[in-house]
Each structure stands twice: as C-alpha cells, then as structure tokens.
Amino acid sequence: MASGRITLAARRAATFVAAIAVAGLVLYAVAQVAGRFGVYDLTRDAGFTDHSLPPPDPRSEQELEALRRFPPGATKLQPLIDATATGGVLTLPPGLYAAPGLIDRKMRIEAQTGAIVDGGGVGSIITVNADDVSITGLTLRNSGERHETTDAAIRLRGRHGSFKDNVIENCLFGFELKQADRNIIRRNRIASRELPEALRGDAIRVWYSTGNVIEDNDIERTRDVVVWYAKDNRIAGNRIRDSRYGVHLMYAHGNAIEKNHFLSNTVGVFLMYANDTKIVDNVITYSQGPSGIGVGFKESSNTLVAHNDIFANARGVFMDASPYDPEGFNRFEMNRIAYNGVAIAFHSDWEGNAFERNAFIGNHRAVTVAGARSAKRNRWDGNYWDDYEGFDRDSDGKGDTPYESWSWADRLWMDVPDAQFFRAAPSLEAIDFVERLGAFHEPQLILRDSAPLFSAPQGAGVRRGEKSS
C-alpha cells in the first residue's frame, strides 16, 4: 500500500512538472510570435515592467565616486546641469568636466571647442531621462567597461532629442537608446575602448525605440550598430569601419539603411527576424575572414536591396531561410556585386527571392547553395553575368540564350568546409576542368536566368548625388 501511494505521488509530481514545461514552451512561442510580427507594446502598455530606467548598478554612488579617476582640475558636471533652468542652455567653455551627469528636464548643452567630459573609467557619462534635450559639440571619454550595466557615453531615455557633432572616445558603448523615440543622432565620431572585437560595446544600441534618425556619423573600432525590437528608424550616411557588424537588426521592422559606407567589418549588414527593411545606396566592402558577409539574412522577409555596391567580401550576400513569411518576398535590384569570393550564398534551396537587373562582375563564384541543391526556386531575370558565353545577334541588349550556372567539381568546396582551403587552387581547378571535359557524372544546375543582359545595366550600384527616399 505504501509503495502504491509513493507511485501515485510520483506520477502527480511528474504530471505537474510536465504541465509547467508545456506552459513555459507556450509562453516562449507567444513571445517569439509577438516579436516576429512587430507586437511591441504588450509589456509597455500593460505596465508590467518599466524599461525606461537603466539597470541598477549594484555599487552605491559613494563606491562609484571612490573608483573614478579624473584629470586634475576637472569641474563637476552635475552642479552645472542642476543650475540650468528648464528649457535653458548650458554653455560649456573649453576645459575638463567630471562625470556623471543626469539630465531630467528639457535643456540644451552647447560645448565650445575643447570642452571634455571625462567618465573617470566608471559607469556611464551622461544619462538623459527627459524629452527635448540637445547636446552639441561635446567630447566624452573614458566611460566604465562593464557590459552588465551598459556603461555608455550617453544613455538616452527621452524623445525628440538632438545629439550632434560630439566626439566619443574610449567609451564602452557610444549611444544607448531604450524606449527613446524620434531622436536625431548626427555627425558624431564614435570609437569604443581598445578591447578585442567581441568585448567592445556597441557604437549605437537602439532598443524598443521608434522613428530615430542616425545619420552622418563616423564610427570605428566598435562592436555593432544594433537595433532590437525597434521600428521605423533611419540609418543613413554613416561611415562604419573596423567593427563586427556594421548594422545588425533583430526583430526590428520597417527600418531603412541608406547611403552608408561599410568598410572592413566582419559583416556589413545583417537582418535577423527583421521584415520590411530597405537597404539602398550603400557601399559594403572588405567583409573578409571565415565569417565575412556583405549583407546577410536570417528568417527575414519583404526586404528591398537596391543600388548597392557590394565589393570584395568573402560572401557578398548570405541567405538563410529568407523570406520566412510564406507570402513574403525579398527583392534585389540594380546592385553591383563584384569581386567577392561568392556573390550570393544560399544556406539551403529556399525560395521567394527575386534578383533582377543586378551586375555580377569578377566574383570567384556567382551563386552557391549548400547541401548539393540549387537556387532555381528563386527568380533570376535580366541580370548581367560577366561569365555569360552567349551572343546578342539581334542587338536588343539581352543574350540570345539563357544564362546557366552549373556545379561541377567545385561542388567539393561548396559542400565540404575543409575543402574550401583548396578553392581556386591549381589542383581543384584541374579536377574541375577534367570534370567538364569528360562529364563523368551529371552536373547540377544552380540557376537559370532566361534573359541575361549583354552588358551591365546603366545606373546599377550606388546612385551618386541622389537623395534616397
């Protein structure tokens, strides 16, 4: 009898644990769907969590103050802020100022050349918890280096702010926006701390924020410009180099990435679970190394990629399960994709992408598909392929026969990662030549463009001097 009661209790406990696990999986699935389809405001509107405040630092203000190290003669910034009236202007003459600074009301800080705010190597330098705040012409340096408290030059929680012509040096994070809408971040120079790439902070981190304009900034040696759960932001005219991700979108919809120059980053632009994005008029170059990608997609839909110059990357475009929406489409139009190791690399034989009027020039391989599959389920129409071997006898600008790309012995390095070491090596090229000559097995058709252009389309690539929409 006792053993029967124990068995019954064990069964009840197992049932309870299983029910908790199922409930957790259901809640996780709901959260994923909410993020995927842009349902942003569940917790904000219900008031469950106030994300507008920075995460608390476990150290007291007295402990932080004791840790800060400032240059001799630095003037404390906070008393100057406190003495400025609501809506007033704080003019900072040349000199050294000691952080931190907390702005909790509408005001402007206008710095003269040589005005420097030093963070003392601890915490964030300026925190903005108010709307309609402007900071112009200031140099901010030496934030803390703790990721768990997001030590930044400027932490922004307000709306309708303006942050222009500032210099950010040796700060872990540059700008950190959280529930901060419709701000302008323009013409700032941003560099992170001298740390390994993965340990640096983000130049600009946008979380849960809408309608911000990030333009004409000069960013180098940071980690990412990352946009999470944020929509309708415009990232334009920036120069981003020597970082990890130039721009990284996650669960972020309706954003525009226009007229930027991405140089020598690990990845130029990467979309993860991001829909309705515009990637237009960008120069994306020298994303090299094993992870090098010019533009990457992971389960992202309804993206326009147009008039970009995608040059000299390990992979010009990388596609993974995109578009994810069964009714969605990604469009690639009028891009110059040139001198890459692989122009377009598909992780699988996914469908729903259209490539029209692009110029493929000087790539070692135009298109690859992992897993011995093909890209035929995507639309290829009217592109220029520099290895096209047909004629244009009627002079209509299009080839008389379709362009076809086949895989022969090069299937080896497409499917076996270790074999990529031999890509373009004489040994593998010789095998490929013999394979084509003897046709010992049936090659695989990778793609067919039924109306290939006979010359590169006029106007492909970045439109110089034109304003993006």
PLM regions and their residue ranges:
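Acidic Gly/Asp/Thr-rich repetitive segments characteristic of extracellular carbohydrate-active
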Residues: Q62-A99
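Extracellular beta-strand solenoid repeats
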Residues: T91, L102, E110, D118, ...
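N-terminal Sec-pathway targeting helices
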Residues: G4-A23
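Extracellular beta-strand/beta-solenoid scaffold signature
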Residues: G119-T127, H147-R155, N170-L177, E197-W207, ...
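Functionally critical loop-and-helix segments that line ligand-binding/catalytic clefts
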Residues: D41, G47-L53, P58, P290, ...
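Membrane-interface motif at the C-terminal end of an N-terminal transmembrane signal
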Residues: V26-T43
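Extracellular beta-strand-rich solenoid/capping regions of secreted or surface-exposed proteins
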Residues: D82-A85, L96-E110, V117-G161, L172-A180, ...
